[in-house]
Amino acid sequence: MSITPEKKAEIIKRFARHEGDTGSPEVQIAILTERIKNLTEHIKKNKKDLHSRRGLIGMVNKRRKLLNYLKRTDFERYQKIIQELNIREATGSR
């Protein structure tokens, strides 16, 4: 259900702006996206796992907030990460 340290390091290396960057919005969004994919698969198999479903909703909301922040501050990087991660553009006025 969680991502392996090797997979996490690979994601950080791919999306980091500079050496040792683990906190930039791009890295956080990429890690959350991987966790969301894994948890979605878990929920497909375990439909009654409401605790995990609530965690999934929280992760999706956090990713949406990070995407909105990135969209406000640097639209080019926002478009690039949306394309690379193959996720839909955030819509709505929240």
UniProtKB/Swiss-Prot annotation:
Pfam families: Ribosomal_S15
SUPFAM superfamilies: S15/NS1 RNA-binding domain
One MF annotation (Gene Ontology) recorded for this entry: structural constituent of ribosome
GO biological process, one term: translation
GO CC entries: cytosolic small ribosomal subunit
Keywords: Ribonucleoprotein, Ribosomal protein, RNA-binding, rRNA-binding
UniProt keyword Ribosomal protein present: yes
Subunit structure of this chain's protein: Part of the 30S ribosomal subunit. Forms a bridge to the 50S subunit in the 70S ribosome, contacting the 23S rRNA.
Role of this protein: One of the primary rRNA binding proteins, it binds directly to 16S rRNA where it helps nucleate assembly of the platform of the 30S subunit by binding and bridging several RNA helices of the 16S rRNA.
Sequence similarity: Belongs to the universal ribosomal protein uS15 family.
NCBIfam families in the cross-refs: S15_bact
Protein name: Small ribosomal subunit protein uS15
Lineage start: Bacteria, Pseudomonadati, Aquificota, Aquificia, Aquificales
Gene name for this UniProt entry: rpsO
